[in-house]
Structures are given as structure tokens and as C-alpha cells.
Amino acid sequence: MFTRILVPLDGSAPAERALEPAIRLAKHFGGEVILLRVVVPEPVLVALPGLSPRPYDVYDAELRRDQEEAEAYLSGLKLQWHGAGVALHAEVLSGTPAEMIVDVAQGRAVDLIVMSTHGRSGVNRLLYGSVAEAVLRGAHLPILLIPLDQ
């Protein structure tokens, strides 16, 4: 039933709470798990009189560094869960998290997305939005949300 499960991660402990249920489901159904880390590029400033934007080479170097850190993070998780008896794949992309999650889910024929909520509310939710909510609206497939412990 669920043979390809996508687990989006942001590097936080709450996000990693989705790993165990995803791996258990994949093992039960004989499936695989795709670990996804989306690196959010910093906005590039346009030069205005009296202001100097960061040079593009600095921007590119920072993005490369963030991608390398994300790859190392996912490699560590794959190593940690190596003995779970499930095929684990890792993917690092750059972009808007919700859009990239939906794109990967569609492009890789994912059967289920398992992700954690961060429990943001009020001003934090207004400022940062809800990736989980955007994925719910954009992905047309089953999604298992793991709530943040209260």
C-alpha cells in the first residue's frame, strides 16, 4: 500500500519525530523511505544607491555550504537507521520547502508523506507560515502528520 514514503526534514528534533513511524510503515509494507532536506536560499539583494549587496560568489559559497551540511545531515540519519531493514534514500534540494516537498512527492510517485508539525501558532505562524498546511493543500496524496508533543 505505502511502498514509497517521503519524509521531509529541516534538521530539527521535532522534524525527526516523523522518522520512526515512516520507517515502521515502510518496513510493514515492504517499501522505501526518501529523506528530503530542502535548503532555503537567502534572498539576493538588489543593489541600491549607498548599499552594496553581497557578492554572488559569497551567496553561491553559502548555498553550497548549506547543501553540503544538509547532505552530511541526511547521511548521518541514513547511518543511524541503517539497521532498520528499510531502503533509505536521501535528497537535498534548494527552494521553497512546501513546493519542493510537493514536487518530489509527485515526481517520485510517492504513496505517503510523513512529516512533523512544529506547533507554531499566533505571530510565529503568521511570520513563518505552516509548511505542513501548504503541503496538505498542494499534495494530492495521503499525509501523516506527527504532532509536536505538548
Predicted regions and their residues:
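Structural beta-alpha unit
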Residues: 1, 14, 28, 76-113, ...
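Short, conserved catalytic or interaction motifs in soluble domains
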Residues: 11, 125, 148
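Short, structured coil segments at secondary-structure junctions
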Residues: 131, 139-141
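Glycine-rich, Arg-bearing micro-motifs that act as flexible, cationic patches
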Residues: 112-134
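Short, structured motif recognition centered on aromatic/hydrophobic residues
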Residues: 6-7, 33-35, 73, 112-116, ...
